Amino acid sequence: MSQQSISNFSSKLLILFWFSMVFSVVLNTVFWFSATMFNAEWFNASYPIDVSLPLSNARSLIGYFPSMISTLLTVALLWQLIVLFRLYEKGIIFQLQNAECFKKLSYLLIATPFVEFLMGVLLSFALSYNDGNWNTSFSIDDSDITMMIIGFIVRVIAVVMEKAADLQEESELTV
C-alpha cells in the first residue's frame, strides 16, 4: 500500500472516528434519559439493580454520570485512534509517537473490565441512593475480558512498534 493510499484511507477513518466519538456521547445521553425519565417502552434498558421507572429528574441525572463512564472509555479509545491515524495521514508510520498511541490504546483496553466494574458499582449506588438501603451490583462479562486480552495483544504490538521505530531511526542515520 502506497503512502498516498494510507493517507487517503486514514482521512476517511478519521471522519468515521470523529463521527463515532460524538455519536456515542449523544446516543448514550439520549438513550439514558429516554429510558429513565420517559420509560420508553420501545427501548429495552437494563440496570444493575431493580428500579421502578420513570425515575425522578434528580435520580436520573445522578445516575447519568456513572452511566457515562464506559462511554468515556470508548471516547478515550476513539481519541487515541484519531491521534494514531492523524500520524498515518501525515506519513508518520514507524515512529515512537505511533508506539505511544498503541501503548495508550492497550492500557485503555486492559482497563475495560475494571471500568465496567466501577461503573456497575457506582450506577447501582446512584440508582438506590434514596431507598433507605444502598444496593450494590456489578457484572463483568466475556466481552470485557476479551477487551482486556486484546489490550495485552495491543501492548505487545506497541513494543514491536517501539522496536520498529528504533530500527527506522537507525536506518535513517546509517544512510
Where are these regions (language model features)?
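Lipid-exposed faces of alpha-helical membrane segments in multi-pass integral membrane proteins
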Residues: 16-30, 65, 69-72, 111-119, ...
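Hydrophobic alpha-helical transmembrane segments of integral membrane proteins
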Residues: 94-124
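Alpha-helical transmembrane segments and their helix-start/interface "positive-inside/aromatic belt" motifs
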Residues: 5-26, 103-106
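Cytoplasmic juxtamembrane regions at transmembrane-helix boundaries
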Residues: 2-7, 81-104, 169-175
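Membrane-helix interface motif
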Residues: 30-46, 121-127
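Perimembrane loop-to-helix junctions flanking transmembrane segments
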Residues: 40-58
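Alpha-helical transmembrane segments of multi-pass integral membrane proteins
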Residues: 116-175
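Transmembrane alpha-helical segments in integral membrane proteins
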Residues: 66-87, 152-166
